[in-house]
Amino acid sequence: MNNYNLSYVISTKNRLSFLSVTLERLIELLNPDEEIVVVDGDSTDGTKEYLTLLFKEGKIHQYISEPDKNQSHGWNKAMLMARGLIIKKIIDDDVFDYSTIRKCADFMLANPAVDVVISNELNASLNNYKQISKSSRFSQFEEWKHKRTESFTFSDVHILIRRSSISFIGLYNTVFVMMDWEYALRMSFLNARIVYFTGYNALSVGHIESVSANKNAKLVHQQGERARLMYNYKGDAADITLWSKFKIKIGKALYAKNNTRADTTFKKDITEAYSYFYLKISEINNQNPGGFIV
């Protein structure tokens, strides 16, 4: 079996237009000590055929296509398939800076006691793609690190996890629809060794087809209250939706102002927007390389 330092894991379903853009770039930039793991949820839009060809050509290392019970089920399968020492979740419609991800992975490889690395985050929406905002959970991390709170939340779009740490922090809870929110609370409540990177390894892209744009608000609220009690979560600004700042940004981008159909549509040809996203995240990290806060 090959030895991999870093596994990029993807769970997807019927998102070929986004997935093809993301995978094309990842495949182009992949290093020899890295693998790509893809779990498809039995897509019907051509995704299966596309991934099957990539797998036959040896461009992705592991691939299955079968129905998932829910979103977290698909991601759990992908994480369990990973063979790398470090696991990085790649969401099919978001943007990632792979050189910065490797910087985070190298830090974890050099510091075996670290379970998880999280970072600052960039946010944008397809309907106004040149407007990019920054978000951070650093103040919440500091509160937790200094034991002023038992748990805090963060999005999983920028998270790196040590594979061997899964036996301690667990996988996604398949009951929770706000799976990254619960996962973050659990990791911090368990006092996992979390390190904060002050750069940006990911850019979250909001659009009308994004999974997080269509959550059941009532169920999210009910499960949020449940998780709050489970993990003694004091709450902060993320409580607005009991999700993460990423979802708050999406909601504002999609439904603010006139709330018309024109505000939520985007071109099916997303190449221009994503080219801009990749350019900007690289520029931002070159201007501010970031550092690690232990």
Question: Whereabouts are the PLM-identified features?
Answer:
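Conserved nucleotide-sugar donor-binding catalytic segment
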Residues: 141-219, 223
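Cell-envelope/extracellular polymer assembly enzymes that use nucleotide-activated donors
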Residues: 4-7, 35, 182
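Conserved donor NDP-sugar-binding/catalytic core segment of glycosyltransferases
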Residues: 99-132
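Short, acidic, metal-binding catalytic loop of nucleotide-sugar glycosyltransferases
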Residues: 24-33
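Short beta-strand/loop segment that forms part of the nucleotide-sugar
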Residues: 33-42, 64-67
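Short aromatic/hydrophobic "clamp" motif used to bind/position activated sugar donors
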Residues: 87
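A conserved acidic beta->alpha catalytic loop
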Residues: 40-49, 91
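Glycine-rich, basic loop-to-helix element that forms the pyrophosphate-binding segment
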Residues: 66-82
